[in-house]
Amino acid sequence: MATNTMLCLLILSVVLALAFATNKKGDEEPENHSTGIFGKVGRVVTVALAMSSRLGGADATRGGGAVYGGNLKSNQLPNNNWMAPPPPMAIRSAKVYDSKHSPAEYLKKFAQDFRRKTGMHSQRHHEETTLEQEKRVAGAGPDPIHHEETTLEQEKRAVPAGPDPKHHEETTLEQEKRAVPAGPDPKHHEETTLEQEKRAVPAGPDPKHHEETTFEQEKRGAPAGPDPIHH
């Protein structure tokens, strides 16, 4: 306000100084007296209009104008900050992952949800299969890689002739009789009884096993009598 007043006083002093200067020139030249008076009046009116317009504009910018003063005061906010723009609102970005979980856990959870929705299963999840699952997949039985040790009963079912000789090398006498009708294998049973030799050789036992014969047997063998070499 003080600066505007000082400016107005300065303008008035300049106008008055110009008016007195023109008045002195008019006294020196009487023929131009009427022109000088109209010129002074015109200048004063022009300066007054300019000053009034400037003062009115200054009052309007301060909110003290007579026409718009009441409306401007009614629109003011309680904190006298009615010209300030509203505070910027926080931009809510899309939630990429929950703050409670790390990005790795979120990706793992997302992959599990995706597999569950699409019906896909990872190979690592189903590497270990049970024996029951293998039986359902392969009708012949479980995979020999997982179950290398098989029982005697399983081998009998697989091989009608009997178990695998690699697993069961020691066979009993009864099994050999079934395999070989003539009798057991002589490699397993080298010592045979006298009764078995009689069945094998109708003439009697093998002389290699029974070299010492009785006197009664020699009589039956040689009617002339026993051999003088033995007796």
Swiss-Prot record:
Purpose of the protein: Mimics host plant CLE extracellular signal peptides that regulate cell fate. May play a role in the differentiation or division of feeding cells (syncytia) induced in plant roots during infection.
The organism of origin for this protein: Globodera rostochiensis
Gene designation: CLE-4B-2
Regions of compositional bias (Basic and acidic residues) in chain numbering: 125-137, 144-221
UniProt CLE- repeat ranges: 136-147, 157-168, 178-189, 199-210, 220-231
Chain intervals for the UniProt region annotation (5 X approximate repeat A): 127-219
Superkingdom classification of source: Eukaryota
Subcellular location: Secreted; Host cytoplasm; Host extracellular space; Secreted, Extracellular space, Apoplast
GO terms for cellular component: extracellular region; host cell cytoplasm; host extracellular space
Keywords associated with the record: Apoplast, Differentiation, Glycoprotein, Host cytoplasm, Repeat, Secreted, Signal
Record flagged with keyword Phosphoprotein: no
This protein's name: CLAVATA3/ESR (CLE)-related protein 4B-2
